[in-house]
């Protein structure tokens, strides 16, 4: 059974749920982006010759319709619009309002997405280039750097001043720094400028709050149209920028961009009608794309190349030689002037400038400029050194040329002077060639000994070589990762090395924990993951450039086992998005994708936000993807309110329809969506096989009513996860309805109610009703709900009714009050301080006892998350032991606890109850503490139920242990536990008697089922026998059993020695005239009280005899002991026989069978009459004060028990090894004697 058991059968996995801090959702700090018209960035269009013929509507319209267009239309129709012609007639340029906001040129080509609270007037037209004079004013000149910053539509960092932007040089940004990885938008400016004058009135309205200045537009950037003003340089720079930047970044672009733009243009006029009626489309099917559109979408990634060379680490038998460079190399003595004024080269990115690297944009300004004194001095020295080096180089060249000429002349002169010598030399050369050819023939037959260093290991054998190579084939992953790093000549990253230390492939999860890696770190890490089978790869919160992102994607695209890729908060631009889509299209094993964006850098462009990505391409890739479909898609942190509803709908439908068989999970935590998206989300959850949707950290206070309606009307058969963590639901009634309808769902396994302190303790009443009704609830969280001790105790008592729970989390509650800190305050009197201390200690002990009881009684519970630093060590160990037993019980159905463990747990439970009984009694006497507190009444009632249950279990355990003792199967340790249980049972009986004798117990804790002031006990897990106050039939009868089962006649003088009379409502004794302690309606029996007094006297005498016997330091002989035990075990033996000693002296004879066993008062009278005393106290007094020996009472039995010292020493010398056995026998005999007496007392009650 254990081999087939899965983790999901025991607990609920939560690795896909979002865990983070709640963000402050104020309007001013909702995001680093502005929430007005600057929500989306302009898509880059291809610069083709045919683009000039495209109408202006194609350029100016947005690529996707925005969800807030109907709101913008209503606002623009309700308020007057200011035309651009009036502005041009006035001849004025709008002045900017602040330095932090600007309008980029790309925004003029898109319709703005305004919020519902927009109250600023709209203008229907933007000032164009024809409206501007030829000579620009100063204000328009200042506006130019804002438009052309890095060639992008707008900057997300709104804190940069205009003066800083105007000082930047375009050529310096091109050659002095690294070009941006994101596509530039400067190429759009000439296109729009050529067509702005044709249909300028068709431009969409913009918000005047965003249009701080008017953006002048230039004419097409040609050589013949350069203006004479300062703006001319700007245009020429822009043209050069478009030529330079369009080459490396347009490789992956195709003409499909124009088609997409045209496709959205066609639906632009009908977007208003679609927004007015959002459900006009079919909600069952995704938007149908034509076949040509599908091909165009896939063409965007057709040219994306994901090939990458991997390293065969297995081929390297040893590490390569290393020469590891320093990460912070020192600057050498030779200084090149260009290094002083230029940025670090790309090869040094992240290595030489790792300490100063704040981002990967290479925006580090040089330390010197061309006008600095140091640069001029270094340049002058460099020129001098260059001239001197050139001079030396020429001199060396001349010397070498002269030497070569002299050598040539010498050879020619030798040949002319001696012709015979030349013939001789030629003959010698031919002979030498023949000899060399013969030597080559012989050398070809020779072989070099392998290995070359065979002499280095003279004692190595072939067997050792085989062992070496076989161990190499099974190398661990840390060796492989270290070798990958050494091949890149770097040291391994410690955070990664710790994760793979001593592990072999395949690896379950690997996280890249370096938030700011260098390029060589990514290269070595990707070399490792490309050759190692890893199921989950996590890159959360890692700053990756586009090149790094491409390396990661290329290394994983051919992985046959990768199942999850985590890219949370990783910057993804347009190029990287296409790489991701191509990866999804080619990889066949990925089923879990995390592209959440819960936080972003302050300098991040709007085009790099997830809501601005090409989601149509993403959906098309999911439709055409081969292999396993996605089962888990995490979109946490996305701004769905900035996306069109059609895109949101298309994503969800595509994700669900591509995987109809397997359950799917969607992450929607910490997002922003409209009510329309929220309604569609819950409809989508009910129609498809949705296992869970993470809604944590969303403000659902205004959407709670909609949620209740959806849960009440729609079926959610497959829903297993429901998270309400940090959802800001404040209404207790709304949460009660949510719990009501969630309890009706058949498959809910996980419920998260964390970070909702405003609902407690009001929600506990509904929780008491609905939590036990969940059919399959396995895990529930109440983290950081600020629960007090009393509320936590009540919650634990409620959760004890949920039989299917396996994991409960109660982390981060209100801090426990410390009793020691109360003494520091001197304002209160000492009495009140002591009372508060006692109350705090009582509350803490009650909570620990409740937690322990909850764990012990919940047999399916395997994990309890609480703040254990405040829990006592003993309780911690008990809880851990119970959880371990529960786990064993789940894994093995035949597992059972041994008898010693059960007895120890029972004794511990009883001790916890008896320790708190005194404090409970004090609070029962004080009616003000419990008069109006329903919670305290409920806890008190649970306390009584618990006491009754423990008392019942103790009695059953005692009966079973006595049965084992009769058959001789009770070991010594269980005999000790039996004695403890007998004392515990007596203590619990006394406590119950005290509580039952209280006259106001019925007022404080109404036991009638008609009382609804707090939850009914009839719903508890305790059996109905406890609810009615009647205990099951037991062999051992206590005082409460006598109350209910024994009928006492009214005229029995032996039971009622005094006559009773009532006087003015008071019950008094006629003989004494004093008021009685109990009312006539009390359940306490006088017969029971008298029997307890007799039992106490016998117990007192037995303890006294045991104490006196222990002073003799003797053991009972085996013969006497056996006869005594045999006599005591027979039920027909006399009860007083153990004290008189006749049974020991006549052990050989058969015990006398009495016709009737004396019990109760007869037994007491018989003992007193035999000893000639009036009470047991007098008997003890005679023995202690009057020196009456026990020999006179028990005869010669004690003399036979105490051997002489000589015999004791001889026995010790003869058998020193038998001493432990003798001691064990002595202890066993003592326990047997005491248990015999207590057994006889128990029999006397029956």
From Swiss-Prot:
Comp. bias intervals (Low complexity) = 27-41, 154-163, 211-230
Keyword Phosphoprotein among UniProt keywords: yes
- Residue positions where Phosphoserine is found in the record: 102, 277, 1013, 1200, 1204, 1207
Composition skew (Polar residues), residue ranges? 58-95, 1109-1133, 1200-1215
Which keywords are on file for this protein? Cytoplasm, Phosphoprotein
Tell me the segments the record calls region Disordered: 19-241, 263-288, 816-836, 1109-1157, 1192-1224
The protein's superkingdom reads Eukaryota
Bilayer-crossing regions = none
Mention any one GO cellular component term assigned to this protein in its UniProt record. Answer: cytoplasm
The cellular location(s) given in this protein's UniProt record come to: Cytoplasm
Does the record bear Acetylation in its keywords?
no
SUPFAM superfamilies per record = RNI-like (SSF52047)
Gene Ontology terms: biological process: endoplasmic reticulum organization
Q: What does this protein do?
A: Required for HMG2-induced endoplasmic reticulum-remodeling.
Q: Any miscellaneous information on file?
A: Present with 195 molecules/cell in log phase SD medium.
Task: Provide the family line.
Answer: Belongs to the GIP3/HER1 family.
What is the name attached to this protein's record?
A: HMG2-induced ER-remodeling protein 1
This protein's species is Saccharomyces cerevisiae (strain ATCC 204508 / S288c) (Baker's yeast)
């Amino acid at each position: 059974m254990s081999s087939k058991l899965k983790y999901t059968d025991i607990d609920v996995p939560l690795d896909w749920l979002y865990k983070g801090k709640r963000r402050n959702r104020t309007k001013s700090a909702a995001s680093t982006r502005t929430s007005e018209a600057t929500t989306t960035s302009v898509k880059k269009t291809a610069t083709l010759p045919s683009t000039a013929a495209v109408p202006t509507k194609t350029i100016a319209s947005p690529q996707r319709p925005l969800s807030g267009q109907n709101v913008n239309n209503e606002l623009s129709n309700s308020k007057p619009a200011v035309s651009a012609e009036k502005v041009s007639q006035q001849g004025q340029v709008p002045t900017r309002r602040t330095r932090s906001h600007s309008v980029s040129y790309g925004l003029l080509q898109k319709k703005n997405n305004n919020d519902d609270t927009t109250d600023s007037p709209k203008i229907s037209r933007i000032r164009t280039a024809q409206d501007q004079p030829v000579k620009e004013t100063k204000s328009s000149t200042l506006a130019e750097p804002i438009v052309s910053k890095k060639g992008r539509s707008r900057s997300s960092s709104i804190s940069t001043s205009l003066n800083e932007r105007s000082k930047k040089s375009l050529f310096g940004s091109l050659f002095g720094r690294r070009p941006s990885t994101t596509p530039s938008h400067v190429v759009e400016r000439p296109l729009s400028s050529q067509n702005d004058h044709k249909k300028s009135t068709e431009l969409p309205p913009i918000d005047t709050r965003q249009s701080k200045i008017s953006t002048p537009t230039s004419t097409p950037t040609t050589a013949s149209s350069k203006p004479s003003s300062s703006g001319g340089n700007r245009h020429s720079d822009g043209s050069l920028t478009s030529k330079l930047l369009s080459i490396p970044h347009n490789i992956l672009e195709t003409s499909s961009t124009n088609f997409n733009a045209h496709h959205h243009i066609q639906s632009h006029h009908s977007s208003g009608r679609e927004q007015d009626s959002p459900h006009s489309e079919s909600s069952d099917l995704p938007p149908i794309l034509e076949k040509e559109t599908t091909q165009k979408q896939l063409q965007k990634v057709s040219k994306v190349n994901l090939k990458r060379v991997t390293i065969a680490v297995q081929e390297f038998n040893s590490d390569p030689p290393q020469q590891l460079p320093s990460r912070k190399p020192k600057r050498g003595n030779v200084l090149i002037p260009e290094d002083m004024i230029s940025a670090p080269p790309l090869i040094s990115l992240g290595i030489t400038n790792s300490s100063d690297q704040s981002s990967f944009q290479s925006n580090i300004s040089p330390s010197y400029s061309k006008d600095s004194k140091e640069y001029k001095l270094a340049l002058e020295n460099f020129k001098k050194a260059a001239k001197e080096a050139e001079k030396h180089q020429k001199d060396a060249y001349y010397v070498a040329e002269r030497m070569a000429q002299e050598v040539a002349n010498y050879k020619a002169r030798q040949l002319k002077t001696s012709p015979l010598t030349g013939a001789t030399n030629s003959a010698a050369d031919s002979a030498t060639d023949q000899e060399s050819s013969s030597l080559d023939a012989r050398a070809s037959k020779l072989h070099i000994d392998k290995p070359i260093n065979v002499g280095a290991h003279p004692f190595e054998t072939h067997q050792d070589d085989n062992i070496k190579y076989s161990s190499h084939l099974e190398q661990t992953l840390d060796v492989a990762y270290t070798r990958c790093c050494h091949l890149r000549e770097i040291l391994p990253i410690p955070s990664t090395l710790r994760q793979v230390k001593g592990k072999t492939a395949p690896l379950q999860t690997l996280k890249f924990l370096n938030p700011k890696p260098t390029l060589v770190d990514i290269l070595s890490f990707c070399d490792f993951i490309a050759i190692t089978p890893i199921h989950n790869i996590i890159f959360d919160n890692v700053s990756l450039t586009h090149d790094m992102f491409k390396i990661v994607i290329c290394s994983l695209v051919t992985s046959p086992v990768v199942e999850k890729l985590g890219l949370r908060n990783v910057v993804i631009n347009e190029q990287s998005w296409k790489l991701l889509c191509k990866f999804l299209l080619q990889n066949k094993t990925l089923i879990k994708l995390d592209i959440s964006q819960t936080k972003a850098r302050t300098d991040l462009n709007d085009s790099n936000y997830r809501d601005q990505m090409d989601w149509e391409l993403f959906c098309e890739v999911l439709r055409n993807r081969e292999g396993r479909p996605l089962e888990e898609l995490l979109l946490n942190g996305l701004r769905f309110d900035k996306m069109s509803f059609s895109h949101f709908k298309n994503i969800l439908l595509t994700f669900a329809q591509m995987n109809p068989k397997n359950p799917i999970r969607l992450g929607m935590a910490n997002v922003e969506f409209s009510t329309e998206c929220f309604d569609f989300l819950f409809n989508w959850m009910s129609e498809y096989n949705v296992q869970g949707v993470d809604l944590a950290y969303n403000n659902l206070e205004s959407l709670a009513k909609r949620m209740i309606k959806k849960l009440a009307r729609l079926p959610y058969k497959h829903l297993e996860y429901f998270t309400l963590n940090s959802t800001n639901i404040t209404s207790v009634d709304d949460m009660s309805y949510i719990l009501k309808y969630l309890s009706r769902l058949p498959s809910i396994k996980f419920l998260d109610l964390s970070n909702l302190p405003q609902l407690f303790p009001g929600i506990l009443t509904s929780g008491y009703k609905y939590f036990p009704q969940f059919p399959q609830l396995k895990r529930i969280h109440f983290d950081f709900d600020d629960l007090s001790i009393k509320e936590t105790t009540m919650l634990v008592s409620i959760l004890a009714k949920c039989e299917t729970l396996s994991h409960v989390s109660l982390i981060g509650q209100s801090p426990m009050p410390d009793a020691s800190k109360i003494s520091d305050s001197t304002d209160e009197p000492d009495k009140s301080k002591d009372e508060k201390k006692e109350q705090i200690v009582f509350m803490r002990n009650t909570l620990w006892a409740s937690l322990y009881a909850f764990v012990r009684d919940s047999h399916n519970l395997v994990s309890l998350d609480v703040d254990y630093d405040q829990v006592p060590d003993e309780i911690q160990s008990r809880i851990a032991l119970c959880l371990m037993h529960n786990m064993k019980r789940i894994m093995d159905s035949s597992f059972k606890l041994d008898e010693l463990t059960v007895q120890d747990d029972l004794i511990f439970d009883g001790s916890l109850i008896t320790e708190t009984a005194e404090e409970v009694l004090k609070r029962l006497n004080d009616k003000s503490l419990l008069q109006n507190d329903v919670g305290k009444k409920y806890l008190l009632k649970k306390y009584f139920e618990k006491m009754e249950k423990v008392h019942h279990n103790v009695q059953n355990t005692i009966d079973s242990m006595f049965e084992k003792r009769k058959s001789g199967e009770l070991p010594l340790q269980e005999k000790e536990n039996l004695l403890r249980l007998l004392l515990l049972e007596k203590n619990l009986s006394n406590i119950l008697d005290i509580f039952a004798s209280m006259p106001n117990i019925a007022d404080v804790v109404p036991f009638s089922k008609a009382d609804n002031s707090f939850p009914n006990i009839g719903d508890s897990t305790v059996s109905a026998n406890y609810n009615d106050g009647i205990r099951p039939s037991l062999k051992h009868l206590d005082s409460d059993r006598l109350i209910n089962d024994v009928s006492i006649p009214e005229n029995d003088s032996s039971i009622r020695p005094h006559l009773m009379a009532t006087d003015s409502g008071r019950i008094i004794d006629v003989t004494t005239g004093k008021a009685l302690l109990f009312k006539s309606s009390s359940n306490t029996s006088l017969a029971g009280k008298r029997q307890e007094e007799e039992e106490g006297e016998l117990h007192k005498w037995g303890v006294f005899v045991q104490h006196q016997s222990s002073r003799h330091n003797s053991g009972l002989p085996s013969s006497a002991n056996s006869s005594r035990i045999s006599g005591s075990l027979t039920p027909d033996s006399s009860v007083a026989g153990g004290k008189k000693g006749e049974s020991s002296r006549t052990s050989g004879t058969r015990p006398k069978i009495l016709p009737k066993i004396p019990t109760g008062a007869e037994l007491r009278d018989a003992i007193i009459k035999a000893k000639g005393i009036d009470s047991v106290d007098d008997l003890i007094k005679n023995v202690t004060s009057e020196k009456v020996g026990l020999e006179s009472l028990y005869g010669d039995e004690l003399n036979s028990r105490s051997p002489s010292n000589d015999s004791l020493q001889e026995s010790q010398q003869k058998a020193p090894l038998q001493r432990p056995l003798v001691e064990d026998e002595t202890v066993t005999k003592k326990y047997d004697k005491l248990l015999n007496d207590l057994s006889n007392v128990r029999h006397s009650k029956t």
